[in-house]
Amino acid sequence: MPQGLALYCFIAAGGATGACLRYFVTTSVDSLFGKHMPFGTLTVNVVGSFALALLYGVIERYDLSDSPYRALIGVGLLGAFTTFSTFSVETLTLLENELWLKAAANVFLNVGACLLAGWLAIELMKG
């Protein structure tokens, strides 16, 4: 595994890629489904949860704990791709607009779907 500056460069490269992917996915999903519900954020969080659980399964299965992929993909790319802060602000905005059902649905969909996606990835890795 890279150390020092090289490790931070791996994380930064993954983070830049993940941020650009998040922007692309959220704007694409929002343009398809509209902005009445934050489906773009839900999409990146669910896909990211699945991908991170899958990555950790691959790392464990193939004993890649010293691999730079954990930093590049897990911390950098998927860390920037998923977004808990945006989920929080979007939920608060729904609450401020007194859209109680949409706010509750956003919380339950994000938490439930992300947990389900992670579980599915883990089960796939058990194979």
UniProtKB/Swiss-Prot annotation:
It comes from the Bacteria. InterPro entries: FluC. The keyword Metal-binding applies. Pfam families: CRCB (PF02537). GO terms for molecular function: fluoride channel activity; metal ion binding. GO terms for biological process: cellular detoxification of fluoride. It is a multi-pass membrane protein. Belongs to the fluoride channel Fluc/FEX (TC 1.A.43) family. This is Fluoride-specific ion channel FluC.
